[in-house]
Amino acid sequence: MSDEMIYGDGAIRRQGLYGSSIENTYAGVLSFMRRNYSRDLEGVDVAVSGIPLDLSVTFRSGARMGPQAIRAASVQLAELKPYPWGFDPFEDLAVVDYGDCWFDAHNPLTIKPSIIEHARTILASGAKMLTFGGDHYVTYPLLIAHAEKYGKPLALLHFDAHCDTWPDDSPDSLNHGTMFYKAVKEGLIDPKKSVQVGIRTWNDDFMGLNVLGAPWVHDNGVDATIAEIKKTIGDAPVYVTFDIDCLDPSAAPGTGTPVPGGLTTAQALKIIRNLGDLNIVGMDVVEVAPSYDQSEITAIAAAHIACDMLCLMRNKKVAGTL
């Protein structure tokens, strides 16, 4: 049977990497946007994977269920061409759902190496990564692997309510509020080329990163925010990380450390959709904690953000710049 004639469970029945199958949105295997579940990365442009870790949270746990929730929320996006793009990204972009990173949660010292090796395996194939957390700590080992692949320092585009640059000089700690302190100290990211968007918690030392706080975004507007991001990052290889608590709790209650005054979903989506000029080398969406969600609106927002990231990658491939 040809792939276009498959009805249901295309994630495990589809033979090719491209195109979409016909699915019921309320049934079937929950890969991200119904992509093939596969660890075969030959010819793959982007590998989606999850890191179900929430051992480093400082308030509410539950982000370990984030990858599963984002996949479940994505099924409605696989039914139609994404708005406002007007195309099926999977006609041109080869995307697989690689499954989840395995780690031993009862042996914390092995978690960081496990995530690094997971990322190295994917990046060595030539595929780019779109990763779902899990808490935000996962971005730190992902940055290590991406800096090995693409050279350091990288630029960082960081959407969040928190700066995550609180001091932490322990090499073995698991803390979702200190990753970018370590990333700057270790030369993984260039603070002068990095931008944090949506910040609305205080830190005495922002480590030299350029901060566009949530009040700044509200006062100056989305277009000015996009312009500042592009001006600061330029053509540097950039890793994009989106902590869902960048959004206001009214739009994303399902997260571990919500902070009032955040971006609206519309603001965030417009920013993401206008990042096509950036040299994006890796992406993640983290901190979705579905046990605190209402009507799945947080997971749905995360799935839309991730879908827009893939649409950016599709356009880059079509333009020959992926």
Swiss-Prot record:
Single GO MF annotation: agmatinase activity
Keywords annotated in UniProt: Hydrolase, Manganese, Metal-binding, Polyamine biosynthesis, Putrescine biosynthesis, Spermidine biosynthesis
Pfam family, one: Arginase
Catalytic activity, EC: 3.5.3.11
EC top class named in words: hydrolase
Family annotation (CDD domains): Agmatinase_PAH (cd11592)
Catalytic activity: agmatine + H2O = urea + putrescine
Pathway(s) the chain acts in: Amine and polyamine biosynthesis; putrescine biosynthesis via agmatine pathway; putrescine from agmatine: step 1/1
Cofactor: Mn(2+)
GO biological process terms held by the UniProt record: putrescine biosynthetic process from arginine, via agmatine; spermidine biosynthetic process
SUPFAM superfamilies, A to Z: Arginase/deacetylase
InterPro entries documented for this protein: Agmatinase, Agmatinase-rel, Ureohydrolase, Ureohydrolase_dom_sf, Ureohydrolase_Mn_BS
List of residues binding Mn(2+): 136, 160, 162, 164, 243, 245
NCBIfam families: agmatinase (TIGR01230), PRK02190.1 (NF002564)
Family as reported in the entry's similarity comment: Belongs to the arginase family. Agmatinase subfamily.
Known function: Catalyzes the formation of putrescine from agmatine.
Protein name: Agmatinase
Organism: Chromobacterium violaceum (strain ATCC 12472 / DSM 30191 / JCM 1249 / CCUG 213 / NBRC 12614 / NCIMB 9131 / NCTC 9757 / MK)
Lineage: Bacteria, Pseudomonadati, Pseudomonadota, Betaproteobacteria, Neisseriales
